[in-house]
């Protein structure tokens, strides 16, 4: 018997996803298709009768707008929302803004896969002369971060290391109080939560593709261990196509 339910949703397609660029901490907005994905995700939650008590998201507009769109669809826009940089996407460092297919053609698909999918290998750092350095590192939303906290690049391991303290200290107590929690975030910060919940190996989490805009439901026991595999809310074809699209992103165009 499930003691708790947790719902995760990865933001819908962003303008930079559409252009196949490494987004990281760049604040790309949702594309029109991404907005529709978020709407469909919200409608799936509405159709299944979901209600929530508190929501968590990043400080990046593609996740925030996904959350807004979902809350609008389920008519729960009044819910409290906690935003934190700790749920941000992985910081892609010097790769930020580069087209993934062009990067694969230049560095080889194997190297791009290492940067995108290896557990503890970070991409090259974002140097001060990077075109998006000031846009990200000098943004006032990060003014309270210490030098140690503000990354110039992150591996998946680094991303999980800054997301999990927030999970443990802020989200877990809410779940254990019986609050119904919705988290709208990014592929890599959500991977960290999934890895932690399911006890996945580093290899397994690298291969996990979370679809965009599709609600993912966990039923958890009193120790916050899943009692069954993650469930997707959406028809099977939608889920399969979304996961295949995510897996194809780092491949060079033929």
UniProtKB/Swiss-Prot annotation:
Modified residues (N6-acetyllysine): 106, 251, 253-254
Keyword Acetylation in record: yes
Segments crossing the lipid bilayer: none
Residues recorded with modification N6-succinyllysine: 251
EC number: 5.4.2.11, 5.4.2.4
Broad EC category: isomerase
HAMAP family: PGAM_GpmA
Listed NCBIfam families: pgm_1 (TIGR01258), PRK14115.1 (NF010713)
Record note on quaternary structure: Homodimer.
Function of the molecule: Catalyzes the interconversion of 2-phosphoglycerate and 3-phosphoglyceratea crucial step in glycolysis, by using 2,3-bisphosphoglycerate. Also catalyzes the interconversion of (2R)-2,3-bisphosphoglycerate and (2R)-3-phospho-glyceroyl phosphate.
Protein name, entry field: Phosphoglycerate mutase 1
Organism (species): Bos taurus
